[in-house]
Amino acid sequence: MKFFVDTADTADIAEMAATGLLDGVTTNPSLIAKSGKQFVDVIAEICKIVPGPVSAEVVALDHATMMKEAEVLRKIADNVCIKVPLTIDGLKTCKALSDDGTMVNVTLCFSANQALLAGKAGAAFISPFVGRHDDVGLDGMGLIADIRQIYDNYDFGTEILVASVRHPIHILESAKIGADVMTAPPAVIRALFNHPLTDKGIQGFMADWAKTGQSIL
């Protein structure tokens, strides 16, 4: 499973990249606004930190303007992945861009039918929002399983990018289903490293080592 971080905070991105475990970054208009920086500048800075796909989302709602915005965004760096909403105009834009060799991440997916359409439009990634799905009493992981089955049935090249990840269990369940990618806020990724028994074990080892009076260095 590929690990993306969902943030526009370059300090957090650099921290995650330093682990060697980060494969890409997702951003959205809300995260860009929170950064307080210029959109193009933020994406350019992120692309210098992470060589993998960096999702930059168009904000237009019509196909023609989406294409114009995508042209600006994909000139920033070779690893920019254009992010479009799952609408008719978004999928028209996805098809045009993917036919031209541009990576496209189709976002705001809430049904397997929508994911099927994105696969037919040639999306590099489909982003189903599991947390928001769960929020309204639906089964987010069930959605991921349905998309996995459909994509396997028809051998789509589109990767399932699990989004709206709220906690480590979302990541675990997505991995068990066979999702290709997950994107999560920095805090959720950090939580993956933690376990009380690991902490307890380290404390025990350190206490015993201190008693020996030795040093490796």
Swiss-Prot record:
GO biological process, alphabetically ordered: carbohydrate metabolic process; pentose-phosphate shunt
Family matches, as Pfam families: TAL_FSA
Keyword vocabulary terms for this entry: Cytoplasm, Pentose shunt, Schiff base, Transferase
Family annotation (PROSITE patterns): TRANSALDOLASE_1
Keyword Transferase set for record: yes
Pathway: Carbohydrate degradation; pentose phosphate pathway; D-glyceraldehyde 3-phosphate and beta-D-fructose 6-phosphate from D-ribose 5-phosphate and D-xylulose 5-phosphate (non-oxidative stage): step 2/3
EC number: 2.2.1.2
Catalytic activity: D-sedoheptulose 7-phosphate + D-glyceraldehyde 3-phosphate = D-erythrose 4-phosphate + beta-D-fructose 6-phosphate
Subcellular location: Cytoplasm
Gene Ontology cellular component list: cytoplasm
Organism domain of life: Bacteria
Active site, UniProt feature: 83 (schiff-base intermediate with substrate)
Keyword flag Cytoplasm: yes
Principal location class: cytoplasm
PANTHER family, per the entry: FRUCTOSE-6-PHOSPHATE ALDOLASE 1-RELATED, TRANSALDOLASE
Family that this chain belongs to: Belongs to the transaldolase family. Type 3B subfamily.
Entry protein name: Probable transaldolase
